[in-house]
Regions:
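Pyridoxal 5′-phosphate
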Residues: 1-404
């Protein structure tokens, strides 16, 4: 059982008031708040261990390098990757997917080849492939979903052809909360000798992720979704795949030798990390992962599921309530509309009550089109949220409903 009140003391922002109301932060799907330990790690890095890494013989550079590479090992162990060489630091999920979209397409795809995505993808797992489609003539195929917001695996199987080169799919929908059966989907793809990329941005903060068990070739996530800083993310890739893909960007550190006639590239993981990396961000991300480990990801998953069920039951008592996403296995995300109230109006009025939710299409316009709506109100929960906050939230939604 989590000691939620003790946890909340690590997050000073939760003590803030908005319009003289206690802040209720239900926008964790967009970004999470940061515990003191992570903020202090950033502060300590800049105050005491700030030097460019990998390139200096002096003490500070070596200390910063050691901290950065230890952070890489922390990520490796958190994901249960086989080697730290399989952990590439990026700016976030979006850059990680763009990296694979560019390098994989260059190495493994020709005009007419196909990538399979799902109807519930975030734009960051659609647009990079569309850019490659325009550049190289590849084609996107889309997995449909049923009325509950679950992917149709029978239709998924039918999408494969001799032109299919990659499956790129979200682990957890940022709108519906659906937890997709990505292990089964990976097995299906592997039956066709097709590699898999999984967008784990909404999964890693909320459930145990074991990349060796999932067996996908690539797995990506962002630090800021899991209590770490913005601007740092992770691309996990099986070493044999990262070895054969070309670099995404050129510059310092990703090279072995350079002449005007030829450049040879560095070994993994540095081949994909051109320029000065965010060595402060990497150590802060590692601190965030250690924080989550101390609480226990299984404890987090169980508690957030309890919050989800409690909030779902409460919202369903409200007249005109429509909750989008009724999958049997969901993450701590609730997207909804009430009657004819515009999602923006609901969000603005909840904000006046101190309640932070997200409104709009949530960077998933194709999914909104499939649902026949323009957008939703989204409440997304964390382990520092409480049932008392949910009670206030439900009362707030009901109060707004009565205004229209």
């Amino acid at each position: 059982m989590l000691d939620v009140q003790a946890i909340r003391k690590d997050f000073p922002i939760l003590d803030h008031k908005i319009y003289d109301k206690p802040l209720i932060y239900f926008d964790n799907g967009a970004t999470t708040q940061k515990p003191r330990q992570v903020v202090e790690k950033i502060e300590n890095g800049y105050y005491n261990v700030n030097a460019n890494i990998h390139r200096g013989v002096h003490f500070l550079s070596q200390a910063a390098t050691e901290a950065h590479e230890e952070a890489r090992k922390t990520v490796q162990h958190f994901l249960n990757a086989r080697s730290s060489n399989e952990i590439i630091f990026t700016r976030g999920t979006t850059e990680s997917i763009n990296l694979i979209a560019s390098s994989f397409t260059d190495e493994c795809m020709s005009a007419g080849d196909e990538v399979i995505v799902s109807v519930m993808e975030h734009h960051s797992n659609i647009v990079p492939w569309q850019i490659q489609a325009a550049r190289k003539g590849i084609t996107l195929k889309v997995i449909p979903m049923n009325e509950k917001g679950e992917l149709n695996l029978d239709e998924y199987r039918k999408l494969f052809s001799d032109k299919t080169r990659l499956v790129s799919v979200t682990h957890v929908s940022n709108v519906l909360g659906t937890v997709n059966p990505v292990k089964t989907m990976t097995e299906i793809a592997h039956e066709q000798d097709v590699p898999v990329l999984i967008d784990g941005a909404q999964a890693v903060p909320h459930m145990k992720v074991d990349v060796q068990d999932l067996d996908a070739e690539f797995y990506v996530f962002s630090g800021h979704k899991i209590y770490g800083p913005t601007g740092i993310g992770v691309l996990y890739g099986k070493e044999e795949w990262l070895d054969k893909l070309p670099p995404y960007q050129g510059g310092g550190e990703m090279i072995a030798t350079v002449s005007f006639e030829k450049t040879t590239f560095n070994e993994l993981p540095f081949k994909f990390e051109a320029g000065t990396p965010d060595y402060i961000g990497s150590t802060a991300l590692a601190e965030a992962l250690r924080y989550v480990d101390r609480i226990g990801i299984e404890n987090i998953a169980a508690y957030e599921d309890e919050l989800l069920r409690y909030a779902t039951a409460g919202l369903n008592t409200i007249e005109g309530m429509r909750i989008f996403g009724q999958a049997d296995h969901k993450g701590a995300v609730l997207s909804f509309l009430v009657g004819n109230i515009h999602h923006y109006d609901m969000g603005m009025l909840l904000d006046r009550l101190g309640i932070a939710v997200r409104t709009g299409h949530h960077c998933a316009q194709p999914l909104m089109h499939a649902l026949g709506i323009e957008g939703t109100v989204r409440a997304s929960f964390s382990f520092y949220n409480t049932k008392e906050e949910i009670d206030t939230f439900i009362a707030g939604v009901e109060r707004v409903r009565k205004m229209f």
